[in-house]
Regions:
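Amphipathic alpha-helical segments enriched in hydrophobic/aromatic residues interleaved with Lys/Arg
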Residues: 99-181, 185-186, 190, 194, ...
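Basic/polar phosphate-binding segments, predominantly the helix-turn-helix DNA-binding elements
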Residues: 181, 185-191, 212-219, 223-263, ...
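Short hydrophobic/aromatic patches on the structural cores and recognition surfaces of FHA
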Residues: 39, 45, 62, 125, ...
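Short hydrophobic-aromatic micro-motifs
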Residues: 65-68, 122-124
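Short, charged helix-to-loop "capping" segments that act as catalytic/coupling loops
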Residues: 51-55, 267-280, 285-288
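A short, Lys/Arg-enriched amphipathic alpha-helix from helix-turn-helix/homeodomain DNA-binding modules
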Residues: 149-165, 175-179, 183, 187, ...
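Generic protein-terminus/edge-of-domain signal
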Residues: 1-65, 71-114
Length: 310
């Protein structure tokens, strides 16, 4: 399994917030929603992304930006344009002084802005909840990534632009998966660039010893894995395997496995709402619902029942 796909095959977009914005200069949006990760694609025109503690970056048509939260940032036609809209948690939109918006409004299915057409069109996809994106992935990302249109070729942005305005049964699930695919494809391109400082866990999948162990852990999480068993499968000594895994991945094998099992459990809780906590626990390698619940709450701050209901 591809390392990025593996990370997003656990917790992933679930009823993600997706929006098509149609904007006419001057415009400026201050984002303070606290979302862990937001993906933006410029379909038409240009947009500046201005982190509070970083350099302003210009997005041109076809470019993609990935902003890692929860720090606020500005998206505008010009860095000097004063904020006109404040976007708060839950995607609540207000004027900077807390009033109701009057200049921008819904102008179609998942479409918002100054009118039905305009010189700037942006697509935004937000992973709004903790646990929807791996902590390991978030820790590897800078506050802002901009991937230029010239750096890659993908049909995903035009497809998302086409699908985002459809109001048909099952469309939320379609958009969630498209957002995941676009994120994975964008980050893969980013990490594979010449000279890229890809994180250790990404490079580890290319290691002949550690890569094989990662595949076993990801595909068979319910197995009673031990360091000795993984080492035997890799054909190396226990000590050599533990040292190589920790050096390559950045954490010991059992620590990695524990986090992976919880990531899968989080996904299963939402994918299969009728499954008992005990059934989910056994699927991911926990001996009881109590053991899973205790570990889950330590990781996510919520019980499995609370996470499923959120």
């Amino acid at each position: 399994m591809d390392p990025l796909a593996a990370l997003l095959d656990g917790p992933r977009a679930h009823g993600a917030f997706l929006l098509r914005s149609v904007l006419t200069p001057p415009w400026s949006l201050r984002i303070e929603d606290g979302a862990p990760l937001t993906l933006m694609a410029t379909v038409r025109g240009e947009a500046w992304v201005v982190p509070d503690d970083g350099e302003a970056v210009l997005m041109r048509e076809g470019d993609i930006a990935i902003a890692r939260g929860p720090d606020p940032y500005l998206v505008a036609d010009d860095p000097a344009t004063p904020p006109q809209v404040l976007i708060l948690p839950g995607q609540e939109c207000r004027t900077p002084d807390g009033g109701h918006l009057t200049e921008l409004a819904d102008v179609g299915v998942r479409t918002w802005g100054h009118g039905v057409d305009g010189p700037s069109i942006l697509l935004t996809g937000t992973y709004g909840m903790a646990g929807e994106v791996s902590k390991k992935l978030l820790a590897a990302l800078p506050a802002l990534i901009v991937l230029r249109a010239a750096e890659w070729t993908s049909p995903l942005v035009p497809l998302l632009a086409e699908e985002i305005v459809k109001d048909v049964p099952g469309q939320e699930a379609v958009l969630d998966r498209l957002l995941d695919l676009l994120l994975i494809a964008s980050l893969r391109t980013w990490f594979d660039r010449p000279g890229s400082d890809a994180p250790a866990w990404y490079r580890a999948h290319h290691d002949p010893v550690v890569g094989q162990a990662l595949k076993l852990l990801q595909h068979q999480p319910a197995e009673p894995w031990t360091v000795a068993k993984l080492a035997a499968n890799a054909g190396v000594s226990r000590a050599a395997f533990a040292r190589r895994f920790t050096e390559t991945v950045g954490e010991p094998p059992m620590t990695y496995l524990a986090a992976w099992r919880l990531a899968l459990a989080a996904d299963l809780l939402r994918q299969h709402p009728d499954s008992t906590i005990g059934a989910v626990a056994h699927q991911v390698g926990y001996g009881s619902s109590f053991a899973l619940s205790a570990a889950f709450k330590r990781e996510f701050g919520l019980s499995p029942q609370q996470y499923r209901a959120s």
